[in-house]
């Protein structure tokens, strides 16, 4: 059904935006940590990512370097105290520069419950509104996201904000203590604005990306 909805051979393939490859250290040790994390939290004995969703984030920092350095350091995160360290596949700076930090076939720790299935895109900024109002950053974000949707046949329903993670049908978490963990960035109202802009861009390339995600009960308070 998803394949039919996407019909995703677009009339015109969305162009690949300019991406600066700036990898964080992700050698054998971190890969092994990611594999162990995946086994603990998803029951998947692998660090290999097969993208089925895209999660949008806000860095809560005012500079690219601050976010990059946080992701580069493979240390236990301050919130959940696990390895590997947190990371995202992309960071989009306020001037619209897209940096890729991690290969798209490798899982990254950016969203509890969805790291097994989702590409993570971070936007340098302090709020959803700031990112939505930054023309250069928003243009790059939409161009990157629509290209990834086309490449991996990801429907609009699986392009979500971090704050929407618990309602994703792809969400799964084996650790009960983590099952309801999420963050405040990219609330549904802001993501509805973002997704509406994506739909406009998708039409330009003849892409039928399907409907937006439905609200689902999360079982969390």
PLM regions with names:
Residues 59, 124-126:
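Short strand-loop junctions, especially beta-strand C-caps/beta-turns
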Residues 9-111:
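N-terminal catalytic cores of peptidoglycan-degrading enzymes
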Residues 14-30, 48, 127-221:
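Basic/polar, cationic surfaces and motifs that engage anionic cell-wall
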Residues 2-10:
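Sec-dependent N-terminal signal peptides
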Residues 54, 112-123:
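Short coil-to-beta-strand
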Residues 71-75, 107-109, 115-118, 140, ...:
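General N-terminal targeting signals
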């Amino acid at each position: 059904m998803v394949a039919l909805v996407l019909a995703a051979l677009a009339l015109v393939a969305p162009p690949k935006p300019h991406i600066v490859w700036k990898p964080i250290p992700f050698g054998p040790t971190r890969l092994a940590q990611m594999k162990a994390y995946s086994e603990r939290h998803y029951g998947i004995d692998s660090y290999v990512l097969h993208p089925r969703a895209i999660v949008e984030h806000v860095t809560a920092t005012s500079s690219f370097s601050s976010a990059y350095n946080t992701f580069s350091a493979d240390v236990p995160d301050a919130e959940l105290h696990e390895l590997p360290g947190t990371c995202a596949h992309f960071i989009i700076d306020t001037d619209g520069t897209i940096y890729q930090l991690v290969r798209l076939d490798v899982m990254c720790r950016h969203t509890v419950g969805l790291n097994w299935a989702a590409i993570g895109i971070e936007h340098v900024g302090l709020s959803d509104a700031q990112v939505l109002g930054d023309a250069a950053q928003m243009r790059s974000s939409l161009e990157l996201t629509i290209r990834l949707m086309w490449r991996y046949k990801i429907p609009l329903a699986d392009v979500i904000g971090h704050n929407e993670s618990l309602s994703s049908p792809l969400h799964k978490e084996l650790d009960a203590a983590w099952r309801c963990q999420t963050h405040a960035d990219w609330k549904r109202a802001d993501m509805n604005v973002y997704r509406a802009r994506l739909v406009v861009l998708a039409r330009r390339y003849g892409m039928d990306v399907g409907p937006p995600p439905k609200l689902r009960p999360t079982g969390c308070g």
